[in-house]
Design a protein with these regions (language model features):
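Active-site-adjacent structural elements in folded domains
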Residues: 23-50, 106-116, 128, 163-185
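Short, compositionally biased low-complexity segments
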Residues: 53, 57-64, 115-119, 233-240
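Non-catalytic carbohydrate-binding regions of carbohydrate-active enzymes
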Residues: 69, 73-109, 141-243, 247-250
Length: 250
């Protein structure tokens, strides 16, 4: 069908196309695209691996919609870009046991074993698993094992580990918080849910239920004295772990 559809759907369709851009800053593909590689082999634009995995996770649904609309050529082109993205993620963002969080504007890895602090981040892991990236190489199982070993606590999965203990200009605000607070190794309910879904998807049902039990109000009565919410409320964030004052869940 003509993408200039009625009721504004044409504009929606056009906006989807921007997801397939290879312009620096718009797609993780730019990191490994020689067309944009500056001296030193990177695009001088920070690249989010989380966004890349969101692309590979949501992309197949977009392909299915195109096929439903009879736009087979567009569907094939979109699938090719998804496959390309998966290959780029495996080549440039697999750290051996988990996926990187990003490359900064200097082309340095974020969320790698090579980093002094912030060696692993929660955000890209679940979507990479649910995108089947590296599944044939066991990357899903390795990632889940790393999550359990390095991110899990009694109160849920922390955002990153180890927490930052000093300011990193390339990371900005996240390294200004005390360890265990907000984006510096805090525990966010929403990205815990991503890992719960990913563990279930990968067949690790017990692991998924364990993580659910750590954040679900029905299972946290033993720690209710430190919760500043009603017993039926899922908190947005848990301020625990390495925090100087480990007491608040709000």
């Amino acid at each position: 069908r003509d993408p200039e559809m009625s009721r504004g759907l044409g504009d929606v369709y056009k906006r989807q196309l921007s997801c397939f851009s290879d312009t620096p800053g718009e797609s993780f593909q730019t990191y490994t695209n020689p067309k944009f590689a500056a001296e030193g082999g990177y695009s001088k634009v920070a690249e989010s691996v989380m966004v890349a995995t969101l692309f590979t996770y949501a992309g197949p649904n977009y392909v299915a919609i195109l096929k439903h609309l009879g736009m087979d050529a567009e569907a094939d082109a979109a699938q090719a870009e998804i496959d390309k993205m998966k290959a780029n993620i495996m080549e440039s963002a697999w750290d051996g046991d988990w996926f990187l969080r990003a490359y900064d504007a200097n082309g340095e890895k974020m969320g790698s074993k090579e980093c002094e602090e912030g060696q692993i981040f929660i955000e890209p892991q679940g979507f990479a698993i649910m995108s089947d990236i590296g599944k044939d190489q066991g990357c899903d199982k390795k990632t889940l094992a790393a999550i359990d070993e390095r991110l899990n606590t009694q109160h849920g999965l922390v955002l990153n580990n180890p927490a930052f203990t000093k300011y990193y200009i390339q990371y900005g605000e996240i390294s200004t918080y005390p360890g265990g607070y907000k984006e510096n190794a805090g525990i966010f309910t929403h990205n815990n849910a991503w890992i719960i879904c990913a563990a279930a998807y990968a067949g690790a049902g017990d692991q998924a239920f364990k993580y659910y039990s750590e954040i679900a109000p029905a299972f946290t009565e033993e720690t209710s004295d430190i919760h500043k919410t009603e017993p039926y409320v899922y908190g947005q964030i848990c301020l625990l772990y390495t925090s100087p004052s480990p007491r608040d869940i709000s």
